[in-house]
Structure formats: C-alpha cells, structure tokens
Amino acid sequence: MKAKLGIAPIAWWNDDLAELSDDVSLEECLRQASVAGFTGMETGRRFPMNMEELGPILARFGISVCGGWFSGLLLDGDIEREKDRIRAQMDFFIAAKAPCIVYGETARSIQGVRSAPLDTKPRLSEQEVRAYGRKMTVFAEWCAGQGMPIAYHHHMAAAIETEAELDLLMANSGEALALLFDAGHMAFAGGNVLRVIDKHHSRISHVHTKDVRGSVIEKLDRKRESFLDAVVKGAFTVPGDGSLDFVAIIARLASYGYEGWFVVEAEQDPKISPPLDMARKGHAELIRLMADRKSVV
C-alpha cells in the first residue's frame, strides 16, 4: 500500500465556529504541519485560491494541496448551475495537481447550525436518493472529464450521514462518484466502519482519518444538542487520541489495495488541544500503524 499523509487546516481554523479558530497565519499553519511531518494539506479559508500566489508559499514548506472542501448544493440544485459554482475551484485544483475536490452536500444540512439538534438532520426518501444519485453521477462524470474528480463526503448532520443512507446513495449512483471515507463521521453516525469499507472499497478514493471520543458521543443528547455542540465538547480528535481501531481500519483498506492520501482531519478546541501537538500525535500514530507495511511515500 502506497500512502501519503496529509492534514486539514480545520484544527487551526474552524469556518463554522469562530470560537474554535486559532489566530494562526497560513504560513504558520503550513510550518506546523510540515514540522509534524505532513507533506499535504487540504485547503481552508486562509488559502489564496490560485497557484500564482499559493504555489511559492507551499513550496517553502514542502506541502502540496491534497484536496479541499466544496459546499455542494446539487441535492436541490441544477447540474449546470453546480458546474458554474465549482469551476473556479476546479481550475485551481487542476493547477495545484490536487487528487480530488471533496464534495460535501450542504443543501438542507444542519451541520453549521448551532441551534439545530442532531435528530433534526435532513432525511431523504428512497425516491429522493435515487434521483440525487443520478444527478451526482452525471455531475461526477463531468468533473472527471474536466480533469478533476470529486470524492463524496458522507457527513454528520447532512442528507447522507448514516451507513444506510450511504449504502442507498452508492447503490443508486455510478462508479464515477467516488467516495471519501471518513471513519470519524461514520462512527459518530452509528455505522460500522469496517463494514462500510467492505461494501464500498471499490469506490473509496480519499480517506479522512478522523477519530472520535466515544465517551463524548455517548453522552450527547441528540434531541437537544447540535453537531457544533458535539464539536465543542470534543467529539472528534486525531488517530491515537480517540476510540477507533485504526489498526483494523488501515489493514482493511490495505487489504483492498487502497493507495492514496490519508488526511488527518479533526476539528476541536485549539486551546484545549493545541493544533501542533495534535498534528504530531496524529502523524506519529499513522506512521506507527503503517511502519510494518513500509507504505508511506
């Protein structure tokens, strides 16, 4: 298994909660990621979205763009409009030689609404998922044809959150719609992370190695507390600091021949969990787990 290790800037800056945003410049964020050992970073709000400006900054720290979030609206939107919306990021990512755009469906999502309890997440009918899967397939085929594939991010508090919802989307979409497997989000949603890999390994093109603190998740009142409440309480963390068995997760991915990026992505309070410390811990754990496989490139 050939693996590359990246990290997301959400540990330094949280776009949804200002209170969880450390006052760190782009250069300092990249420096800390490099010091921790990472060679890739997903984009965030402080990234200039053009390689003329960003390229020299990345080169200074030996970091490449290993993906980045796009707030999708195709569930309730039009394919042609979605093409227009993603075009600028697509051109930037092609220039950056990024592996994919992380497509997160935000239509009807409550992931950024602090007042919306977890139990009020959007729920789609089977018919709606079928129609959505068809649209996503056409859109994913177009993106790949343009030279920049998308990786679909199942996400807490969004329309495709649970294992059953993901199964239905995968069953009603084509191979062009690749999957971003996020262990933390799937575990938080009550899914069996290894079973999800078993079922959808052929579609997985990108991996977020997000861990969870089971003790925090178990105590959440889903009828009262929101996704952002859970984040503030520390539901997520890096591998080696949480409850998930990443030995089994990485072994299962390797058994199916996964090769690509493993991205540490764990939003939490930077005052309680300093980003550099967390980055070092996450990187060290992934290196430890992959050492026997001699797989990090």
For the regions a protein language model found, what residue spans apply to each?
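Hydrophobic faces of well-ordered beta-strands that scaffold small-molecule active sites
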Residues: 3-9, 41-43, 65-68, 101-103, ...
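Conserved small/polar residues in nucleotide/adenosyl-binding loops
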Residues: 296-297
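Active-site acidic/histidine proton-transfer and metal-coordination neighborhood
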Residues: 79-178
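Conserved, mostly hydrophobic/aromatic
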Residues: 7, 33, 41, 58, ...
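Short, acidic/polar
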Residues: 18-32, 82-92, 189-197, 246-249
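Acidic (Asp/Glu)-rich catalytic clusters
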Residues: 1-2, 31-35, 48-67, 88-98, ...
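Acidic/histidine-rich catalytic cores of soluble enzymes
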Residues: 41, 133-243, 293
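Active-site mouth loops of central-metabolism enzymes
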Residues: 11-24, 73-82, 121-128, 237-240
